[in-house]
Amino acid sequence: MEELAQSEFFEPLKELWMYENLVGDEGAKALAESEQLTRLRYLSLYTNRIGDEGAVALANSKTLSKLETLDLSFNRIGDRGAEALANSKHLKKLKELHLDANRIGLRGMQALAKLSGLQNLQILNLSYNRIDLQGLELLNDSKRLQEMSAVKTDYPHIGG
């Protein structure tokens, strides 16, 4: 993946769909560090066995600063990865974040309820995570999430 991420063929890309490719944390790190992806607006990495390390690398990527949509659904991202994404200083243009079917629990929900780093985010998908009653209340009471176009969870009274 590291060689592919450095390929000149990646340079003109605005969209990259790499779902179901076993990218893993190392592959996510290679993409995050790739200097060839500076034009990327849409990145789909669902079902790739990406965990917290990969999510942290993507959140800290200066290369992906133009990203508007990030799909990390059906991976292995937990609280640490969710916190890094929610507090990212580099994904300022992100409008859509798909984190459905991961392993995000209460700590991750707390960070996502605040979304201190993703000021332009309008759509957040958190369906099929480890949302308990306390996490549900955090999401429901979040002023930041109430301002968004859509927040998707497994619960019909939160988001839509």
Label the model's feature ranges.
Residues L13-M18, L40-L45, L67-L72, L94-L99, ...:
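Conserved hydrophobic beta-strand positions in leucine-rich repeat
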Residues E8-E11, E35-T38, K62-S65, K89-K92, ...:
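Inter-repeat linker/turn residues at the boundaries of leucine-rich repeats
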Residues E2-E3, P12, A28, R39-L40, ...:
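Amphipathic alpha-helical scaffolding segments comprising HEAT/armadillo-like alpha-solenoid repeats
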Residues S116-G160:
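Leucine-rich solenoid repeat scaffolds
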